[in-house]
Amino acid sequence: MSAVGRTLLVTNDFPPRPGGIQQFVHNLAIRQPAGSIVVYASRWKGWESFDAEQPFPVIREETSVLLPTPAVARRAAEIARDYGCDAVWFGAAAPL
C-alpha cells in the first residue's frame, strides 16, 4: 500500500461552474499527488468534457447543488469506501 492516503473532496464549487472558489478548489485538487484525490461534486453545464480531462476521478451527483441530505451522506460514504479514501475535504462549508 502507498504511504500517500486518498482523499475524497466533496464540493458544490468545482469547474466547469465558474467562480473563484471553484478555481481555488480545482487548483487544490490538481496539486495533490497522483492517485490521492477523488472528487464528488454537483453537475454543471459542460461537466462531462471537463471531467474527462482531469487526472483524477470526478463523480457527479445528478443535481446542480449538493445539499446535506442523508442520501448525499450515504453516497459520499460509499464513494469513500469504494475508492479507499481515508480523509474527506469539504470544498466549502455551505451548504454542506
Which residues fall in each region the model found?
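Extreme N-terminal starter segment of soluble prokaryotic enzymes
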Residues: 2-7
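Short His-centered aromatic/hydrophobic patch
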Residues: 90-96
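N-terminal strand-loop element at the rim of the active site
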Residues: 11-18, 24-68
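Short, well-structured alpha-helical segments in soluble
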Residues: 74-84
